Amino acid sequence: MKAEVREMKRQFGEIRLFPETLDDLWHLSHLVGPGDLVFATTFRSVEAATDKLRPEKVEKRPVRLGIWVEKVEFHQHTNRLRIAGIIESGVDVAAHHTLNVEAGFEISVVKRWRPVDCERIRRAVDASAYGVVHVVSVEEGEAQIYRLRQFGPEWVTTVTAGSSKGADTGTRSALFEKTLDTVAAVTGPLVVAGPGFVKDEFAEYVKVRAPDLAGRMVAVETRRIGRGAVQEVIGQGILDRLLGDLHLAREVALMDEVLVRIATEGAVAYGIDEVRKAVAYGAAETVLVADTLLRDDEATGVIEQAERVNATVVVLSTEFEPGERLDAIGGAAALLRYKIE
């Protein structure tokens, strides 16, 4: 994503946002909400002028509109974000209109920007500079390819060759060739994962056949295959070493720490009421919030109070396992500096 601050005063102002990927649209779905003012160039029906009482045709022309947002919907499978609301500026003021935002579609958002919003924009901008991480889980006869979106792992395809039983060298070479053809266009980092020696042989194959890609590749030993291998890769901190700071890896580590402290009755609070109390006492060091609560006024108040007392606020995506686990314990948790009664 590209971002440009147009005007800002005491956290209120206009930021111009240019989404470039599906990840960016997902980020926008959490940055834009009801009550925000969004400006964009869009198409709207304009009646052609005629001498007749009824117009012969209706044209759609590009117009610049400002919309008071009422509803935001992220459509992952159509690569689209829908922003619906009431026109405040432009043609047909007070009428309803829906913006269909896709990659390459520029919008300007006017609102009060919370620190958690600015942090999300920073992550989105940084991620665009790295390129998307792909993980290839390799076993005998099969390779599964995943793309690591900001909201979680996305299955891309499964490559097969021969059978997992009794595979010979020729079959394995065929698998490697087909898999490399599939990931050859990857421009970001590549992680090759899996148990045993097959993943190591594939990594060596890539080094010989695609040295440029090999320069962005790392091989990782995992116990599981497929999506389970992806989870292990993230949990092992491999992505941190590849990118320095990928939010997914941080989510896994933080949520693991929350669950460990709950199991050992350590310095932790969970559930929005307990987290609010911890923040009020000044005991909260890191506050975790599920993205599903970002539209909740009560949760928003807790987030703002946490930021005022300099607690770190981390928003977890419920599209991915750590966010699902957080959602299951009330959608909010806090790692504390000390235990409170």
From Swiss-Prot:
Pfam families: eRF1_1, eRF1_3. Its EC number is 3.1.-.-. GO terms for biological process: nonfunctional rRNA decay; nuclear-transcribed mRNA catabolic process, no-go decay; nuclear-transcribed mRNA catabolic process, non-stop decay; ribosome disassembly; RNA surveillance. Gene3D superfamilies: 3.30.1330.30, eRF1 domain 2, Pelota, domain A. GO terms for molecular function: endonuclease activity; metal ion binding. One of its GO terms (cellular component) is cytoplasm. The keyword Cytoplasm applies. SUPFAM superfamilies: Dom34/Pelota N-terminal domain-like, L30e-like, Translational machinery components. May function in recognizing stalled ribosomes, interact with stem-loop structures in stalled mRNA molecules, and effect endonucleolytic cleavage of the mRNA. May play a role in the release non-functional ribosomes and degradation of damaged mRNAs. Has endoribonuclease activity. Belongs to the eukaryotic release factor 1 family. Pelota subfamily. PANTHER family: PELOTA (PTHR10853), PROTEIN PELOTA HOMOLOG (PTHR10853:SF0). The N-terminal domain has the RNA-binding Sm fold. It harbors the endoribonuclease activity. Monomer. This is Protein pelota homolog. It comes from Methanoculleus marisnigri (strain ATCC 35101 / DSM 1498 / JR1).
